UniProtKB/Swiss-Prot annotation:
Name of this chain's protein: Ferredoxin-1
UniProt cross-references to PANTHER family, sorted A to Z: FERREDOXIN, FERREDOXIN-2, CHLOROPLASTIC
Entry's transmembrane regions: none
GO biological process: electron transport chain
Domain of life: Bacteria
Species this protein is from: Trichormus variabilis (strain ATCC 29413 / PCC 7937)
Listed Pfam families: Fer2
Ranges where the 2Fe-2S ferredoxin-type domain occurs: 4-96
Purpose: Ferredoxins are iron-sulfur proteins that transfer electrons in a wide variety of metabolic reactions.
Family to which this protein belongs: Belongs to the 2Fe2S plant-type ferredoxin family.
Amino acid sequence: MATFKVTLINEAEGTSNTIDVPDDEYILDAAEEQGYDLPFSCRAGACSTCAGKLVSGTVDQSDQSFLDDDQIEAGYVLTCVAYPTSDVTIQTHKEEDLY
């Protein structure tokens, strides 16, 4: 099992935090376990509350059912169903940018 560095950037609050996330754990779950408060609702990849945008790195979010191909190509990610597959930087709190 690999562990990756996941950097979570909240532009609105001007914060940036880096956490260690195993490749078999969702980013949202790991962030919560390490004391970070990220937005979420369904926890199933079926809404957009937890949406973020990839700045760098790669994730596996094959469990999600909400984002369309264009949104995925634009770098949007649902943190509740995203496993890191490399070191990753994500801008959090991006739900409004989807619409």
